[in-house]
């Protein structure tokens, strides 16, 4: 399953503009999540953070992406002591590019929101994607894929 990854330029919590096509590492993990500092998103982000060094051994960069502001990302990143950057996409450019900004239903109400999704990218191609994932255990599943690719 190889398809061209959507290129983007987004500001990171380290203050650097990240452009996908300029990243030199072998793998990039982009995980999209609904909202900073919420229970499921905290579980998923903490799990990626705990496994960060194992991803790094495989020349893999991790980026968490949401529509939250850079200021929100910075506070949350500091709180969780993240070893990787979060990317702010307030204009929803990458969220729409990866088709994770979509209509959702909750308690009979419809609204637009981010579907928790992850993409592994190699040489500007998507080699694996997960959509509508459960937060618990997902980071380990992504690491298993990278380790065995």
Label each region the model flagged.
Residues 1-149:
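Chalcogenol-based redox active-site neighborhoods
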């Amino acid at each position: 399953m190889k398809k061209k990854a959507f290129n983007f330029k987004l500001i990171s919590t380290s203050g650097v503009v990240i452009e996908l096509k300029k990243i030199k590492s072998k793998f990039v993990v982009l995980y999209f999540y609904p909202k900073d500092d919420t229970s499921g998103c905290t579980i998923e982000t903490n799990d990626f953070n705990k496994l960060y060094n194992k991803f790094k051994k495989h020349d893999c960069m991790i980026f968490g992406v949401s529509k939250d502001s850079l200021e929100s990302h910075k506070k949350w990143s500091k709180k969780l002591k993240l070893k990787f950057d979060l990317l702010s996409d307030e204009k929803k450019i990458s969220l729409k590019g990866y088709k994770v900004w979509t209509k959702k239903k909750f308690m009979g109400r419809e609204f637009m929101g981010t579907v928790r999704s992850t993409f592994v990218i190699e040489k500007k191609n998507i080699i694996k994607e997960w959509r509508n994932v459960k937060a618990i255990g997902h980071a380990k599943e992504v690491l298993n894929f990278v380790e065995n690719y």
